[in-house]
């Protein structure tokens, strides 16, 4: 088992929640706590994210291996943003342990290398990493603005969020991720792709996943990229999907 922090909320069929960039598990999925009335929510903190020890780099392939190891029994897998890419990779590694797969706006930009809007967006993100502020707080604000996140970080950053901002600066960018669409397409478990209806870039990525994986598709507006922060609207979509996938 990977030596990363995991919290357990509620009881019921297991649902493994994988956070994205900036915020760790509990902060990312706080609005999903009501679902613990029906589900055993397994909330992971990826490597380098508080309260785990600091790490030198954030890598979706390493994280996918960690998440795959946590799939010790059949469970539902849910990933947000960077964690959505992680979840896609992990599900392909251990498909027999996945009851269903849900991803929220995964930045799998490599799926659309010839789409000019997606390509320009990914290039701009890489320029932010190459030329953006060295100060973690300033970089965090620039990143949040770029991706359209609903997160508003406090000023000054508390130690936990500062640690997360520091690992963000050393994140392996997801345009390098190679999503195994063929493997995932052949898996029997149902898939759900969720977007926030705020970005043609993320909509395009989600549309490709819907088509290639024969996935269900949902749009939950109101919180930009941070779709799960809408609370009840997102929870209703997720609960209905999970219940049907039992």
Regions found by a protein language model. Give the residues of each.
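Conserved HGGG/HGGXW glycine-rich cap/lid loop of the alpha/beta-hydrolase fold
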Residues: 1-53
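Active-site loop/oxyanion-hole signature of alpha/beta-hydrolase fold enzymes
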Residues: 42-78
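Short beta-to-alpha linker loops that shape the active-site pocket of alpha/beta-hydrolase fold enzymes
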Residues: 45-49, 107, 221-223
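Conserved serine/cysteine hydrolase catalytic core
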Residues: 156-222
């Amino acid at each position: 088992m990977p030596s990363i922090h995991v919290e357990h909320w509620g009881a019921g069929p297991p649902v493994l929640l994988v956070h994205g960039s900036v915020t760790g598990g509990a902060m990312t999925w706080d609005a999903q706590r009501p679902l613990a009335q029906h589900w055993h929510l397994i909330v992971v903190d990826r490597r380098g994210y508080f309260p785990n020890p600091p790490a030198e780099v954030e890598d979706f392939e390493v994280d996918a291996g960690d998440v795959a190891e946590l799939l010790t029994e059949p469970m539902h897998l849910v990933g947000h943003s960077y964690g959505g890419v992680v979840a896609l990779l992990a599900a392909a590694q251990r498909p027999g342990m996945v009851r269903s797969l849900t991803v929220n706006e995964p930045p799998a930009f490599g799926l659309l290398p010839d789409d000019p809007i997606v390509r320009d967006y990914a290039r701009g993100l890489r320029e932010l990493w190459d030329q953006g502020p060295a100060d973690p707080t300033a970089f965090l604000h620039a990143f949040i603005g770029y991706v359209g996140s609903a997160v508003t970080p406090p000023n000054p950053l508390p130690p936990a969020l500062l640690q997360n901002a520091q690992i963000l600066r050393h994140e392996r960018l997801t345009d390098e991720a190679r999503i195994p669409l063929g493997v995932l397409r052949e898996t029997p478990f149902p898939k759900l792709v969720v977007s926030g209806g705020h970005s043609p870039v993320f909509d395009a990525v989600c549309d490709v996943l819907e088509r290639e994986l024969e996935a269900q598709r949902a749009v939950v507006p109101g919180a930009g990229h941070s779709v799960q922060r809408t609370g009840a609207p997102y929870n209703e979509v997720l609960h209905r999907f999970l219940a049907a996938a039992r």
